[in-house]
């Protein structure tokens, strides 16, 4: 399964910024970006986010660059959260205003009761006049209570099912991202070792050529 686009993983403009920053560092923005965005959402404090980021990027960046990059990412993410919360609040206010405006335009026409309906109701009231108010109240209360319990149970079950589905989906997404990130991390580590070995071999060859030149002189 392909990793979700990092632009979608971060709130506001943070996703696009993170993608560009990772690309400038020579890291896969799709894999690292989605994983980093998930970590930032999960951790609760700035220190926890910094610690988590160090664990992700320690194998990819030099020590002198690591702390600066991690702090830069956390600061950008925090700024985007403030902007995102403000925009969300404005959207909620606008939605409430629109709803109130629509309700104000709705006119409810009172139902006209015919003379025949009035007579029928009067007859029914007279027929059941022997039923006490207390019994009516008890029956009505029992019925209302039962209905409320049923409706409440159905809503609660529906709500719990929805929450469980969302949590399971998020857990699966995190696991998939974690697996893909670990694979990419291992690939990057092997590549760095190969590059380091090749660099060392070039140094050795250059050293031998220099020594040969000195002997010839």
Swiss-Prot record:
Coiled coil spans: 34-135, 168-212
InterPro entries to which the protein is assigned, alphabetical: CCDC43
Keywords attached to this entry: Coiled coil
Keyword tRNA-binding in record: no
Region (Disordered): 180-217
Comp. bias intervals (Basic and acidic residues): 180-204
Compositionally skewed regions (Basic residues) per UniProt: 205-217
Any Gene Ontology CC annotation: cytosol
Family: Belongs to the CCDC43 family.
The protein's name in its UniProt record: Coiled-coil domain-containing protein 43
Species name: Gallus gallus (Chicken)
